[in-house]
A protein has these predicted regions:
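Class I SAM-dependent methyltransferase SAM/SAH-binding core
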Residues: 39, 45-95
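Conserved Class I S-adenosyl-L-methionine
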Residues: 180-250
């Protein structure tokens, strides 16, 4: 994990432009309960796992590679008293063994890059949930297409429209049964906390060899968000469901 993310997300309870209420709504859409077993891939600082375990009493296997995030997740899970429900596993998501039909639900929120994009993520996660189970992916999408002249996506931003995003679920054999989209407030809260945290970090680490790089990177991200991305880029959790009948492609 780039050190950049450990700095700018050091105060984020949720590391995506969403809210605690929307994560709990996700749990309702996936019909979670005490008997449910959930896989949370690239789980970061453990925000969604913590909320779902507390709200629904479900078991969660959280997979995260970055020790900086896992350290925080361990502390949060213990403090919340749900360490008997949340299993934290340090592993590269791509290399984590996904047993067929082991889970009732699988999440990948803001981390489809683990499998090189949305289609790869759905292909990896769908077989890991039982028939009738759920796959939820939080993914950016373009609000407008084609993109306006003068705007160039960053490398790796091969996102599509919301309709095309849902279509990829259907192509993976999943029926779209839920959509939880981020509001403008969700986006502004998420992005502007980056700005505050980075400014405080730069003030406290002015002699750090990466300070100039981080300052310039933060300036560029802020300007691009305010000029372009705030209007162009959406983010949503799309929930797909596997067919009930065994043997149907998923």
């Amino acid at each position: 994990m780039p050190w950049w993310h450990a700095v700018i997300e050091s105060r984020h309870e949720l590391q995506n432009p969403t809210s605690a209420d929307k994560i709990r709504l996700l749990g309702e859409r996936m019909e979670l309960g005490p008997e449910s077993h959930v896989l949370d891939m690239a789980s970061g600082r453990g925000g969604p796992a913590l909320l779902l375990a507390r709200a629904f009493g479900c078991r969660i296997t959280s997979v995260e590679q970055a020790e900086e995030f896992l350290t925080v997740a361990r502390e949060r899970v213990r403090a919340a008293g749900v360490d008997h429900l949340v299993e934290l596993v340090q592993a590269d998501g791509r290399g984590f063994p996904l047993e067929r039909e082991r889970y009732d639900a699988a999440l990948c929120l803001g981390a489809s890059f683990v499998w090189d994009g949305l289609s790869g993520s759905l292909s990896a996660l769908a077989p890991a949930v039982a028939p009738g189970g759920f796959v939820a992916v939080g993914e950016p999408y373009w609000r407008t297409w084609p993109l306006p002249e003068g705007f160039e996506p960053d490398p790796g931003e091969d996102f599509v429209t919301l309709s095309e995003t849902a279509g990829r679920f259907e192509s993976a054999g999943l029926t779209v049964v839920g959509l939880i989209a981020s509001s403008q407030d969700d986006w502004d809260r998420y992005e502007s906390l980056h700005w505050l945290v980075l400014e405080e970090w730069l003030s406290e680490h002015s002699d750090d060899p990466q300070s100039d790089e981080f300052r310039e990177r933060g300036r560029r991200h802020r300007e691009r968000y305010l000029r372009w991305r705030r209007d162009l880029l959406g983010w949503a959790i799309v929930v797909g469901r596997r067919p009930e009948v065994r043997g149907v492609r998923a």
